[in-house]
UniProtKB/Swiss-Prot annotation:
Tissues expressing the protein: Widely expressed.
Coiled-coil ranges (or none): 126-227, 266-293, 375-461
Full protein name: Afadin- and alpha-actinin-binding protein
Main location: other
Region (Disordered): 293-316, 567-615
Gene Ontology MF terms in the entry: protein domain specific binding
UniProt-listed PANTHER family: AFADIN- AND ALPHA-ACTININ-BINDING PROTEIN (PTHR46507:SF1)
Modified residues (Phosphoserine): S290, S293, S313, S319, S537, S541, S543
Compositional bias per record (Basic and acidic residues), positions renumbered to this chain: 568-581
UniProt subcellular location: Cell junction, Adherens junction; Nucleus; Cytoplasm, Cytoskeleton, Microtubule organizing center, Centrosome, Centriolar satellite; Cytoplasm, Cytoskeleton, Cilium basal body
GO cellular component, one term: centriolar satellite
Phosphoprotein among keywords: yes
Length: 615
C-alpha cells in the first residue's frame, strides 16, 4: 500500500501547542526538550522507553527530575506529586499514591492516543484507496469525454456534408423542373405544329384524291370493261340497238353527264347550307357580342374598368377581323375553325358572366328568399323532359346527316377506279387512317361531354333568365305605379280597350295602341330600352321570335296587372291575330293571364332548346 504516512491527531496537536507555550515560559533543560519531541513523535513509545528514561533520569538528578515531572504534571492538570507541608521551611515529601495515579492516567491517555492513531491510519488508508479509485474513474471519464467530443465533431462534420449535399440536390431538382417545363412547352408547340401539318397534309391528300378521281373518270381504258349480268329487256318488248363504238361512247357520255349533274346539284346544296350556317354563326356571334357588351360593363366598371374594356375590345376586334376577311373566299375548314374558336371564347365569357350573376343571385336569395320565387319541381321536370326530347331529335338529325354524307362519299365507282385505288392505298395510310379514326372518336366523346355541360349551363341560364324577367316585370309594375296617376290611367285604358273591342280593322288597333306605347316608354325609360336591345340582339331564327314573344308577353302581363283590366276587355279581334301571323306585340294581347304565362313558358323553353345546340 505504499509508505506509511505520519498523520497527527488534532487533539494532540493542540496539546503540543499548549505544551510549547508553557515550556517557552519556563526555563527547560535539553533533556526536557528531547522528551517533548519524543512525546510528539509518531514512533511507538515501547521501543524507546528504556532509552528515554536512561537518559532522562540519573542517580544524580533524581530530585530535579521529580521536580520537573511535578511541574509538568501540574501544568497538564494533574495533582502535585509532593505532599503539602504545613510549614514552608519543612522539606516536601514525595506522595507515592499521587505518583501512581498520575502514571495510570498517563498510561490510559497513551492507550487512547494509540487507538486514535490506529483509527486515523486505517481511515487514511481508506481515503488513499478511495482517492486512487476516484483518480482512475476520473481518467476513464476524461477518456470517454475525449471520445464523445471526437464523435460529436465527426457527426457535426457529417451533418454539414449532408446539408451541403441536400442543397445541391435541391438545386438539381429545381434545374430539372425548369428543364421539364421547357421540354413540355417545346412538346406542346411541336404538337400544335404537328396538328397543323397533319391538317395541311389531309387537305393535300383530299385534293390529290379528287384529282386522281377526275383523271380516272375522264380517262378511258379499252381493255377493261364492265359487263351487265341478267339484262332486263325493255318494257315495250323492242330489241335494243346494236352495240357500237358510237352508242357506247354516247351512253357513257350521258352517264357521266348525269353523274356530274348530280354531283353539281349536291355541291350547290351543300354550299347553300354552308352559306346559311355561316350567316347564322356570324349573326349569333354578333348578337352574343351585343348581349355581352352592355352586361359586362356594369360589374366590371365597379371592379376594373380597364379589364372589361379590353375584353370587349378583343371580342369586337375578333368580329371585325372575321368581317374584314373574305369569309366566302376561305375554305370551309378555316372558316369553321375561326367561327368555332370565336364562339367558344364568347361562350366561355358568357358562362363566366352567368356564373358571377348566379353567385350574386344566390347571395341576394340567401338574404331574403320567398317561396314564390322558387320554381316548382314539376315545371323543372317538364322542362328537362322537353329538353331531352329536343336533344334526341337533334341526335336523329345528326345521324341522318351522317348517313347522307356517307352515302355521298360511298358513291359507286368503276372497276378501273377501284383497282387503281386499291393499288394506290398503302398500309401506312391505312394505319394512319385508323389512328385518325380513334382520335376522331375521342374528340367526339369530348364533344359530347362538353355538349352536356353546355346544355346544363343553358338550363341554368334559362332558369335564371326567367327569374330575372319576373323580377323585372315586378319592378316595372312598381315604377309604373309610383310615377303615374293610377285613376286617370285606368279611365284612359278602359276607353282604349273599348275602342279595341269595337273596331275590327288592324290599322285602327295600331292607331289606338300608339299613344299607349308612347306613354309606357315615357314612364319607364330604362327597362323597355333594355328589352328592345335584347330582342334586337337575338339571332333571326325561330328561337328569336319565341324570345320576342316572351318579352312582349311579360310586358303585356305587367301592364294588364297594373291597369286592372278584365280578360274580356283585353281580347283582340280575330282580324288582328291573322294580320300579325302569330307574332305577339304590344297591340295584340293574350286571352287571359294564364294564357300569357303558358305562352311565355313555351316560348322560353323553345328558345333555350335551340340554344342548347351551341358548341
Amino acid at each position: 500500500m505504499g509508505d506509511w504516512m505520519t498523520v497527527t491527531d488534532p487533539v494532540l496537536c493542540t496539546e503540543n501547542k499548549n505544551l510549547s507555550q508553557y515550556t517557552s515560559e519556563t526555563k527547560m533543560s535539553p533533556s526536557s526538550l528531547y522528551s517533548q519531541q519524543v512525546l510528539c513523535s509518531s514512533v511507538p513509545l515501547s521501543k524507546n522507553v528504556h532509552g528515554v528514561f536512561g537518559v532522562f533520569c540519573t542517580g544524580e538528578n533524581i530530585e530535579q527530575s521529580i521536580s520537573y515531572l511535578d511541574q509538568e504534571l501540574t501544568t497538564f492538570g494533574f495533582p502535585s506529586l509532593y505532599e503539602e507541608s504545613k510549614s514552608k521551611e519543612a522539606k516536601r515529601e514525595l506522595n507515592i499514591v499521587a505518583v501512581l495515579n498520575c502514571m495510570n492516567e498517563l498510561l490510559v491517555l497513551q492507550r487512547k492516543n494509540l487507538l486514535a492513531q490506529e483509527s486515523v491510519e486505517t481511515q487514511n488508508l481508506k481515503l488513499g484507496s478511495d482517492m486512487d479509485h476516484l483518480q482512475s474513474c476520473y481518467a476513464k471519464l476524461k477518456e470517454q469525454l475525449e471520445t464523445s467530443r471526437r464523435e460529436m465533431i465527426g457527426l457535426q462534420e457529417r451533418d454539414r456534408q449532408l446539408q451541403c449535399k441536400n442543397r445541391s440536390l435541391h438545386q438539381l431538382l429545381k434545374n430539372e423542373k425548369d428543364e421539364v417545363q421547357k421540354l413540355q412547352n417545346i412538346i406542346a408547340s411541336r404538337a400544335t405544329q404537328y396538328n397543323h401539318d397533319v391538317k395541311r397534309k389531309e387537305r393535300e391528300y383530299n385534293k390529290l384524291k379528287e384529282r386522281l378521281h377526275q383523271l380516272v373518270m375522264n380517262k378511258k381504258d379499252k381493255n377493261i370493261a364492265m359487263d351487265v349480268l341478267n339484262y332486263v329487256g325493255r318494257a315495250d318488248g323492242k330489241r335494243g340497238s346494236w352495240r357500237t363504238d358510237k352508242t357506247e361512247a354516247r351512253n357513257e357520255d350521258e352517264m357521266y353527264k348525269i353523274l356530274l349533274n348530280d354531283y353539281e346539284y349536291r355541291q350547290k346544296q351543300i354550299l347553300m347550307e354552308n352559306a346559311e350556317l355561316k350567316k347564322v354563326l356570324q349573326q349569333m356571334k354578333k348578337e352574343m357580342i351585343s348581349l355581352l357588351s352592355p352586361q359586362k360593363k356594369k360589374p366590371r366598371e365597379r371592379a376594373e374598368d380597364g379589364t372589361g374594356t379590353v375584353a370587349i375590345s378583343d371580342i369586337e376586334d375578333d368580329s371585325g377581323e372575321l368581317s374584314r376577311d373574305s369569309v366566302w373566299g376561305l375554305s370551309c375548314d378555316t372558316v369553321r375553325e375561326q367561327l368555332t374558336n370565336s364562339i367558344r371564347k364568347q361562350w366561355r365569357i358568357l358562362k363566366s358572366h352567368v356564373e358571377k350573376l348566379d353567385n350574386q343571385a344566390s347571395k341576394v336569395h340567401s338574404e331574403g328568399l320567398n317561396e314564390e320565387d322558387v320554381i316548382s319541381r314539376q315545371d323543372h321536370e317538364q322542362e328537362t323532359e322537353k329538353l331531352e326530347l329536343e336533344i334526341e331529335r337533334c341526335k336523329e338529325m345528326i345521324k341522318a346527316q351522317q348517313q347522307l354524307l356517307q352515302q355521298q362519299l360511298a358513291t359507286t365507282c368503276d372497276d378501273d377506279t377501284t383497282s387503281l385505288l386499291r393499288d394506290c392505298y398503302l398500309l401506312e395510310e391505312k394505319e394512319r387512317l385508323k389512328e385518325e379514326w380513334t382520335l376522331f372518336k375521342e374528340q367526339k366523346k369530348n364533344f359530347e361531354r362538353e355538349r352536356r355541360s353546355f346544355t346544363e349551363a343553358a338550363i341554368r341560364l334559362g332558369l335564371e333568365r326567367k327569374a330575372f324577367e319576373e323580377e323585372r316585370a315586378s319592378w316595372v309594375k312598381q315604377q309604373f305605379l309610383n310615377m303615374t296617376n293610377f285613376d286617370h290611367q285606368n279611365s284612359e285604358n278602359v276607353k282604349l280597350f273599348s275602342a279595341f273591342s269595337g273596331s275590327s280593322d288592324p290599322d285602327n288597333l295600331i292607331v289606338h295602341s300608339r299613344p299607349r306605347q308612347k306613354k309606357l316608354h315615357s314612364v319607364a325609360n330604362g327597362v323597355p330600352a333594355c328589352t328592345s336591345k335584347l330582342t334586337k340582339s337575338l339571332p333571326a331564327s325561330p328561337s328569336t321570335s319565341d324570345f320576342r314573344q316572351t318579352h312582349s308577353c311579360v310586358s303585356e302581363h305587367s301592364s294588364i296587372s297594373v291597369l286592372n283590366i278584365t280578360p274580356e276587355e283585353s281580347k283582340p279581334s280575330e282580324v288582328a291575330r291573322e294580320s300579325t301571323d302569330q307574332k305577339w306585340s304590344v297591340q295584340s294581347r293574350p286571352s287571359s293571364r294564364e294564357g300569357c304565362y303558358s305562352g311565355c313558358s313555351s316560348a322560353f323553353r323553345s328558345a333555350h332548346g335551340d340554344r342548347d345546340d351551341l358548341p
